[in-house]
Amino acid sequence: MAVTMLQDWCRWMGVNARRGLLILGIPEDCDDAEFQESLEAALRPMGHFTVLGKAFREEDNATAALVELDREVNYALVPREIPGTGGPWNVVFVPRCSGEEFLGLGRVFHFPEQEGQMVESVAGALGVGLRRVCWLRSIGQAVQPWVEAVRCQSLGVFSGRDQPAPGEESFEVWLDHTTEMLHVWQGVSERERRRRLLEGLRGTALQLVHALLAENPARTAQDCLAALAQVFGDNESQATIRVKCLTAQQQSGERLSAFVLRLEVLLQKAMEKEALARASADRVRLRQMLTRAHLTEPLDEALRKLRMAGRSPSFLEMLGLVRESEAWEASLARSVRAQTQEGAGARAGAQAVARASTKVEAVPGGPGREPEGLLQAGGQEAEELLQEGLKPVLEECDN
């Protein structure tokens, strides 16, 4: 979803999202001078702005740019599109409001005017005197940008892939948001609703809707959404979801606690579809942990003892055991690193002292002659320091 991308990018850059604009659809061959000129022409009424960065979006096959304003977005002045190379560039900003409360006000103050009615008639219907008509008109003008911001909010991106690509949404998330937006777009023409729906589709999903509309151009956006739900919705059979539960295993690089959470999602789904009895969920969870996960020796031993005793941990109990095991592993790793660093430092110090002992300076008493006692003392001292430095390492080896 473009608004989510804007918010995440602003958060990463440390910028207030309400002062940020996301410009989408910029061609790769658009040079910086042309880009800056187009922005200045379109955003001049918004005041000073700064381009914070650019990134290529594969789903659009175009570049996106993050722009920071010197003040919060003025919803009455911000353009929805910027004329530029390759066609208009879309402008995304954080809506000032969301929800039906302002949409309701929009219906009161906006739609009557579209239908040729006067604000005065609305005032009369609300039981407000004509002297307050100007007040009502000002409220309508103030609310309208908020309503328009909600109505013009774009959909997220769904392509039909099993694993959504970066910038795409899973079907469940996309379906929830799209269903809500179709309700918000009640005052928009059906043709425009279909166009906005197609904007949020890529790949297989887009091809499917194109085929549906080619077969029957009169299909509504709601009809197309229902068809997408039939194809990409959760239609797994009991046998399929049961197999997924019984074959789930910890992936390479996946934390054990993350596997427990992923396995629980599958178990809950299987129980909802009655592919797995609730009474057997704990037993299946324990079996998958013992056969499909990478366990530390203490945790493996503890779980096997529980199975032999006929005591299968619940989800929360299993998660608690796993997190204790992960904490123990982390503590052990820190301890090993600390001992290794301490031993390395001691060895380096001992070696330095040993080298220094071989370079005892000559004293008066003959060229090339060195006092025997000094050599013996230096050698003995170096040996003592060496033994002292290696002591932690030797103890570690003994242990």
Swiss-Prot record:
Disulfide bonds: none annotated. Belongs to the PNMA family. It comes from the Eukaryota. Expressed in the brain. This is Paraneoplastic antigen-like protein 6A.
